[in-house]
């Protein structure tokens, strides 16, 4: 298999692990910085260049796309798709999952529960918007944030109004959600590959914080997701069109609630905590999907 990995940094743990495993399994692998890819769009002739040279013939591409380059990198990934290259996470699925509002709407439409969420635009509606949500504490989130950045806990209604007004003044898109106190500032990261959860870890927020992200000082321990939690995680990934995803859940009195579905979840924390070789499961999944596609006589490269 000729495999491309879209990544801005070849030294990142997740990128290195995927390259290592793919080469160990006999595949030809190249890391491509999506911002150095550029394309020509012509009816019947989609092409791509990288650092001055044409690139084609890739059987599969694994996207490791950061939030800051989502839209351009998704366009690059879409061009690969139009050239007949398979991706476990298609460009449209990445765009769906990176837009928290859109993702929440799609998940709710599939009957997947999450913290109650409100969204609005006009300052005149702020008080009624918060009334729809219920009493504080409230969680205010930037719509396209990541790794816990842009997530604020507001313990008073007046503080929530102030935050909403400040974010509107910055022309930032945001959501406001109910705070689930019984989650005890912890969540589960369920790593979905294909039709199953292949690894799980429990993340606990650092003392004095409520965000459990490891990048913000949270700690992680090995965990086992219940059958219900695994089912919710897989359904959530598939509802957005993803086959590789990190699904973040919290445990509540009404069952598992989805916080976020990450289309490019990091491998370092989950592999170290769970002891599972997640990278090889991703590469094997790509191999299996390509075998299915090629057996259907639609394998183009």
Curated annotation (Swiss-Prot):
Residues that coordinate or bind Mg(2+) 2: 260, 262
Keyword Ubl conjugation: no
InterPro entries linked to this entry: ATP-grasp (IPR011761), ATP-grasp_RimK-type (IPR013651), ATP_grasp_subdomain_1 (IPR013815), RimK (IPR023533), Rimk_N (IPR041107), Rp_bS6_RimK/Lys_biosynth_LsyX (IPR004666)
SUPFAM superfamilies (UniProt xref): Glutathione synthetase ATP-binding domain-like
GO (cellular component) term, any one: cytoplasm
EC number: 6.3.2.-
Residues reported to bind Mn(2+) 1: 248, 260
Keyword Iron: no
Residues binding Mg(2+) 1: 248, 260
Example GO BP: translation
Pfam families for this protein: RimK (PF08443), Rimk_N (PF18030)
Binding positions (ATP): 141, 178-179, 187, 211-213
Every ATP-grasp domain range: 104-287
Superkingdom classification of source: Bacteria
Record key words, sorted: ATP-binding, Ligase, Magnesium, Manganese, Metal-binding, Nucleotide-binding, Protein biosynthesis
GO MF assignments: ATP binding; metal ion binding; ribosomal S6-glutamic acid ligase activity
UniProt-annotated binding residues for Mn(2+) 2: 260, 262
Cofactor: Mg(2+); Mn(2+)
Bound cofactor: record note: Binds 2 magnesium or manganese ions per subunit.
Family stated for the protein in its record: Belongs to the RimK family.
HAMAP family according to UniProt: RimK
Name of the featured protein: Probable alpha-L-glutamate ligase
Organism field: Xylella fastidiosa (strain Temecula1 / ATCC 700964)
Organism classification: Bacteria, Pseudomonadati, Pseudomonadota, Gammaproteobacteria, Lysobacterales
The encoding gene: rimK
